[in-house]
Amino acid sequence: MANIKSAKKRAVQSEKRRQHNASQRSMMRTFIKKVYAAVAAGDKAASQAAFVEMQKVVDRMASKGLIHANKAANHKAKLAAQIKKLA
């Protein structure tokens, strides 16, 4: 455990940030799973609507540095290709 006051503060801030990031990451994964579920169900309209929402969330997380920009691009490209196949 930290003995210096500033180190204690940093430990508290770090834990708070870790919990917030975990929450944001979980929320992002939920949006991604919604798109996969809609694609698996074969519902093109629902999958496109879910994709639009997922895209916003993933881009926001990439811009904040929670995930790498390339990972966001990979998620979007992979899901867009699957939705395109539904036609």
Curated annotation (Swiss-Prot):
Gene Ontology terms, MF aspect: small ribosomal subunit rRNA binding; structural constituent of ribosome
Basic residues: compositionally biased ranges: 1-11
Q: Which InterPro entries match?
A: Ribosomal_bS20, Ribosomal_bS20_sf
- Kindly give the Pfam families that the UniProt entry links to this protein: Ribosomal_S20p
Ranges for the region named Disordered are 1-26
Task: Give the GO biological process terms.
Answer: translation
Record keywords: Ribonucleoprotein, Ribosomal protein, RNA-binding, rRNA-binding
Q: Does the keyword tRNA processing apply?
A: no
Its Gene Ontology cellular component terms are: cytosol; small ribosomal subunit
> What family does this belong to?
Belongs to the bacterial ribosomal protein bS20 family.
Which function does this protein serve?
Binds directly to 16S ribosomal RNA.
Which protein are we looking at?
A: Small ribosomal subunit protein bS20
List the top taxonomic levels of the source.
Bacteria, Pseudomonadati, Pseudomonadota, Gammaproteobacteria, Pasteurellales
